[in-house]
Structures are given as structure tokens and as C-alpha cells.
């Protein structure tokens, strides 16, 4: 299910890249070049050079970009549904390379070095594509229909979860995001160019928050840090995973305006859906963790079978996790 979901998001990416706007030079100036502004030279210079290089033939180049994303999505969906681990590995490896190039040459490192806000997508949706892909990488299988994801629930997954949410909270403490009215301005800007009902929703939210001081973004930063720490250290992990999903949906609606996909100029759904996917990956990892390391929804649990050597519960949980990861 998780691999199919990741593939579906890639397919949406590809479909959005086929929008008419993406075949014009406005895509080059308003998306590629704009994303590089304010970044260090190692981001700015190659991005500007690439933009000028592809601008004369942007229609051809954009068709290639969109096709790559569709192929990645199709490879993930087909590989997951037909239980083809080798196809999944090849597709995921290609997606990692593509994601790095997009993050560097098209997203300006997701605004990580320019005061970008995690409420509008920083540190970049493609970072989450890579994280999800690594966690769902199929390990050695013992049968044709088995495609385990050994990294789910492991220390690397928990460490990555903590690092992402802690860094997101740190970004919110940057001066640009601590200015008076910063949160209100971010929401109002997200609603610009959106259809009437979305614009009205975001305009109302922005008006409600107008004039708020840095306490609002500081509070969100603390929530992000708490989510990262709690899940990483098994403190009511499921409760905090639910909280992360609620926050991700809020970010997607109010900070990202559904990734601007309703404007005809959105290149991807942005980070909101991928944060939800990451949370579901972590949830699946909890379901498949060894019994002695499991935690209940109310706190750390104790499994007597861990002392007696019984493995039936672990095997059943691992089978459930494997099915969910497909």
C-alpha cells in the first residue's frame, strides 16, 4: 500500500508537469530561476545556466521531465502490485538521482538556505520522496510474493524522523519566520491565485492571524520538535504520529494551498501528502517492530513472550508490515 501510494504521488507529479504552463518560458523564469534566487553560488549559478540552456526548447525538455516522473510512478506502482522487487529497486534508485537533481537545480534546496518555511514546503518535497523511497526499499525476499521493507521501524527511520521534524522546527525559528505577521503573510500568499473557495478560506485564516507575533510560529516549532522526539524515543508514538498527520494536513491546506495544484502552475502536491506518507511508514514500522521493543498507544509496553523466546507475535506483525508496505 505504501509503495503504491508513493508511486501514485509520483504519477500526480508527472501529470502536473504536463500542464500547459510548464511548456512555456514562464515556467523557466517563474519556477526554475525564481527558486534559485538568494541561494549560494553553487545553487544559483548552475540553476541559471540550466534555465538559459533549456529555455529555447522548453517544450521538449518539459515533456522529458514529465515523462521521467510518470515512468518513476508507473515503475513503483507496477513493481509493488506485481511483486517485482528488482523493478522497485531500479525505479527507486532512479528516483533518488532525479530527486537530488530537482532539489538542487529546480527547488533551490527547498529554501533551506534562504529562510524558507516548513509551512510552505521547506526543506523541499523531494527530500521526502527520497526518505520514503529509502524506507520502502525492498530487502532480500524469501519468496516471489514477499517484498519486506527492513528499514521500516528501525533506528535509521526513527533518527530520520527526528532529524526532519527538528530541522523543520529550526527553520521556523529563522528571523524571516519570526517576524510579526509572518504566519499571516505566508497563508495569504499561499491563497494568491487560488480558486474562489480556497482563496476565501486562506484569506479568512490570514485575517484571523494578522498581527500575531513570533509566538505563533514558535509554538508550531515546539510542536514539531515534540513530534520528532516522541516518535523517535517511543513516547506515545501512535498519538504523536496522529498529531503529525493532522499537522501535515493543516500545512498542506493553509500553508501550501494544496500544492497550488488548482492554479495550473503547481509542479507537485508539495510536502503535505508526503509527510502523511512518512507518518504511515513510521506507523507500519511500529506494527512490525520486535515485541520487546513495541510500545502501546499509552506508553511503553511489556511483552512476556520476548522473555520466553516466542516469535509468533513478531512473525505475524512482520507479515502485516510487509503487506502494508507493498
State the predicted function of each range:
Residues 1-326:
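Extended, low-polarity transmembrane helix blocks
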